Amino acid sequence: RTRSEGARYFIPTWDEWLKAAHYDPNKANNDGTTGGWWLYSNGSDSPFVPGPPGELVNGQLATANFGFQNAGDLSCWSVPLGSYAGVQSPWGLLDTAGMTQEWTEEALGFIDVGYEVRRIEGSSWGDNPAVLLADSVSFGAGSAFPTLNFASNGFRIASVVPGSGTLISVAVGVMLV
């Protein structure tokens, strides 16, 4: 159950997901070098501010879709793509924090006993703000059975950029209900 040879579109591996969300080839480091990892997928080492898009939370503009259920006419399940203005990964990915935890291609253990668990990354709309660390590159990732439906899990589709081996995301997580 791995990527088909020559696939044009696919669910990214965990490594591909992390790099697309956290790695910045232009990050200026203290030692004068460039290229490195941001702690959070918003291109910084500052955590996300959970809440509805466009709202102030403790004096800061909300930057991630988790920690709220409803805000006026807006439901946490239907926040439009890109609603958190200016919040994106160094590669331009939108909404890597909140909305849905995203499946990756990586299978974990238990395969030889007839079932597998897949790695998921990021946070979802239903997460408590106390789990902010889950969006940190240093936290690791969760896992779940792909045969179970969770409204908090979705996926991101990636593609190979024509003429290079670099991956980009072309579609954002779709909630599996």
List the predicted regions and their residue ranges:
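Hydrophobic aliphatic residue packing
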Residues: 81, 161-162
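Short, structured beta-strand segments at or near domain termini in extracellular proteins/domains
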Residues: 150-160
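A short, hydrophobic C-terminal helix/tail in secreted or cell-surface proteins
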Residues: 162-177
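Short proline/glycine-enriched turn/loop segments at secondary-structure junctions
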Residues: 110, 138-149
